[in-house]
């Protein structure tokens, strides 16, 4: 059953808030943890493309860019279904009769484009064995945190984040779904030169979408005209995507995602964290950040 049919199920909102469990030290929903053996044993294919990110790091944006490239800028083809059905979210597990990510992925003909938020050590090993291409997108911690906080408030399938102050501490401790942001971005960074991985930064994509989309085109071994490239830049701009029901999750009932609390696509601007962190919170966060990121060669911009 597609996600849009959720409104027909008359789901109890109180029951949508998930129980959580840890799998190998990483927090997941109880349903994901119960399905973990199947997720771990998922069979990737050599022609799969995996879009991997930490939550709220530009995943849907990258999915739309990739879909437009694969379909040579054909907007109609990219409107064929919502993002969830076009690019199965491999670990996301939903109660029957809804389609979980694995169900959708296993039914999908090749070549498949898939999505994950899994940290690198939790990625099903078949992706490495089959040498599937992977695009990883990283976003600076403070903006990621604020976006994840508001997403957790509006998405009834995620744990209640509490206040922003409480959530900052939860985020720093890595006690959110998919675990520590710090370990996630560093883990994928450390393997980027050992596999077919294109590692991108959200801030770079915002600063110069044309340059970054060209990197994706090259990685996918595609050849597109300047006209198609400009069409992709326009169609995947924040303002256009915010109005696209096949990408902005507005087709879901408010019992699942309540856009009156916060839209799925909120602002998307690097540096927006400054509107939410107090000076003290920012200084405390920065001190903790330096300790957790010590020794890593990865660098982030917190504004552009």
Swiss-Prot record:
Keywords tagged on the record: Cytoplasm, Transferase
InterPro entries, A to Z: P-loop_NTPase (IPR027417), Sulfotransferase_dom (IPR000863)
Enzyme Commission number(s) from the entry: 2.8.2.-
One GO MF term: 3'-phosphoadenosine 5'-phosphosulfate binding
Active-site residues, as the UniProt record annotates them: 117
A Pfam family reported for this protein in Swiss-Prot or TrEMBL: Sulfotransfer_1
Superkingdom field: Eukaryota
First-tier enzyme category under EC: transferase
Subcellular location: Cytoplasm
Annotated GO CC locations: cytoplasm
Annotated residues for binding of substrate: 115-117
Keyword Transferase belongs to the record: yes
Binding-site residues, 3'-phosphoadenylyl sulfate: 56-61, 139, 147, 202, 236-241, 264-268
Expressing tissues: Expressed only in olfactory tissue. Detected in sustentacular cells in the dorso-medial portion of the nasal cavity.
Family annotation (Gene3D superfamilies): P-loop containing nucleotide triphosphate hydrolases
GO BP term, pick one: xenobiotic metabolic process
Regulation of protein activity: Inhibited by 2,6-dichloro-4-nitrophenol but not by triethylamine or tetra-n-butyl-ammonium chloride.
Keyword Transferase tagged: yes
Record function comment: Sulfotransferase that utilizes 3'-phospho-5'-adenylyl sulfate (PAPS) as sulfonate donor to catalyze the sulfate conjugation of drugs, xenobiotic compounds, hormones, and neurotransmitters. May be involved in the activation of carcinogenic hydroxylamines. Shows activity towards p-nitrophenol and N-hydroxy-2-acetylamino-fluorene (N-OH-2AAF). Also shows activity towards cinnamyl alcohol at pH 6.4 but not at pH 5.5, and towards a number of phenolic odorants including eugenol, guaiacol and 2-naphthol.
Protein name: Sulfotransferase 1C1
Name of the encoding gene: Sult1c1
């Amino acid at each position: 059953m597609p996600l849009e049919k959720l409104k027909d199920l008359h789901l109890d909102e109180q029951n949508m808030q998930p129980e959580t469990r840890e799998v190998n030290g990483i927090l997941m929903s109880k349903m994901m943890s119960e399905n973990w053996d199947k997720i771990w044993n998922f069979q990737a294919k050599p022609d799969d493309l995996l879009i991997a990110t930490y939550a709220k790091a530009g995943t849907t944006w990258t999915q739309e860019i990739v879909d437009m490239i694969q379909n040579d800028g054909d907007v109609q083809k990219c409107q064929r279904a919502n993002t969830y059905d076009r690019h199965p979210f491999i670990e996301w597990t939903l109660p029957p009769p809804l389609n979980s990510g694995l169900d959708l992925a296993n039914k999908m003909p090749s070549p498949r484009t898939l999505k994950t938020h899994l940290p690198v050590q939790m990625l099903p090993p078949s992706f490495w064995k089959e040498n599937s291409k992977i695009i990883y997108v990283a976003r600076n911690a403070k903006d990621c945190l604020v976006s994840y906080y508001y997403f957790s408030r509006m998405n009834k399938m995620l744990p209640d984040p509490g206040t922003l102050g409480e959530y900052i501490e939860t985020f720093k401790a890595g006690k959110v779904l998919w675990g520590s942001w710090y370990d996630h971005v560093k883990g994928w960074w450390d393997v980027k030169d050992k596999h077919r991985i294109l590692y991108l930064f959200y801030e770079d994509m915002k600063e110069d979408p044309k340059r970054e989309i060209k990197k994706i085109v090259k990685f996918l071994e595609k050849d597109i005209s300047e006209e198609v490239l400009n069409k992709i830049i326009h169609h995947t701009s924040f303002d256009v995507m915010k109005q696209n029901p096949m990408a902005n999750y507005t087709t879901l009932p408010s019992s699942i995602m309540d856009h009156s609390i916060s839209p799925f696509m909120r602002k998307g601007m690097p540096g927006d964290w400054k509107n939410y962190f107090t000076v003290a919170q920012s200084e405390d966060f920065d001190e903790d950040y330096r300790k957790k990121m010590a020794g890593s060669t990865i660098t982030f911009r917190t504004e552009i």
